[in-house]
Amino acid sequence: MKTAVNGLGLIGGSIAKELNRQASPFEVYGIDSSELHVSKAIELGLVRSTLSLDEAINRCTQMILAVPADKIQALAIDVLDRIGAHHIVFDVGSTKDEICKTVAAHTMRHRFVAAHPLADTEFSGPEATHLNLFRGK
């Protein structure tokens, strides 16, 4: 299953790490505005490589939006405007009210899952990823 993680910090990177640990054949790709985060995520084996948003939509069936909460609304609409019926988009931001209101009337709303892993630490970035961050969540 080809998955793109958009945002390779603590939460997105930890999700990528967990997906890579699974027995099923996940192919995890990364998107991040920070070249440092991208190169570190590749070096740590969190993602196979980086993709542009267009490449991720064309290549992957799952997209995880792990960018800062204030950027998720615009990104969610941009992604939902461009996906097909075979895609699923997850948001793992810390707030839900405005995000859910923003996507509520979108024609691809049924392909969007608003989620929160209820996990965090005081650290950030790909080096802060934690394999067991979501255990028991």
Regions found by a protein language model. Give the residues of each.
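NAD(P)+-binding Rossmann beta1-loop-alpha1 motif at the extreme N-terminus of oxidoreductases
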Residues: M1-I57
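A short helix->loop->beta-strand "cap" motif at the edges of active sites that frequently abuts
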Residues: P25, I83-H87, M108-H110
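Short beta->alpha hinge that forms the Motif I/post-I loop of the SAM-binding pocket
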Residues: S33-S34, V67-P68, V92-S94
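Conserved short alpha-helix immediately C-terminal to the canonical SAM/SAH-binding motif I
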Residues: L36-H37, K71, K96-I99
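Short, well-ordered alpha-helix to beta-strand connector turns
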Residues: V47, C60, H86, G136-K137
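Rossmann-like NAD(P)-binding element
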Residues: L53-F90
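Short secondary-structure boundary/capping segments
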Residues: D54-E55, D81, A104, T129-N132
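Rossmann-fold dinucleotide-binding core
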Residues: H106-K137
